[in-house]
């Protein structure tokens, strides 16, 4: 049996560019790709915190250190500069792989400052 699990997440990153006339994709600061484990051309889901839009695209490498989140092509209709987004990548894992499974999550502060990294989400309290 396989399970589809959250592999990586960039939490509340701010969109820095929305470029309609660009080949579709989402450019992400290369340092964040490396830290999160998201691969270039990997399918990603983007959840727009500000307008509720949810869409699928793929990651491309943005300039390292740029703090870039550029939503490109048709996806530029789903997010505008300044919107806060959650970017997730998922993967299939076998039962054996799940024994040591931990996602990589990067949490962003305003201005796309990396505030912390984690591999677990705290239990939500009632």
From Swiss-Prot:
First-listed, main subcellular location of the protein, grouped into a coarse class: cytoplasm
Sites bearing Pyruvic acid (Ser), chain numbering: 25
Official protein name in the record: Aspartate 1-decarboxylase
Residue positions binding substrate: 57, 73-75
Gene transcribed to yield this protein: panD
Subunit text: Heterooctamer of four alpha and four beta subunits.
Reaction(s) the record says it catalyses: L-aspartate + H(+) = beta-alanine + CO2
BP terms from Gene Ontology: alanine biosynthetic process; pantothenate biosynthetic process
Biological or metabolic pathway of the protein: Cofactor biosynthesis; (R)-pantothenate biosynthesis; beta-alanine from L-aspartate: step 1/1
Pfam families: Asp_decarbox
HAMAP family, per the entry: PanD
Cellular-component GO terms for this entry: cytosol
Broad enzyme group: lyase
Cellular compartment(s): Cytoplasm
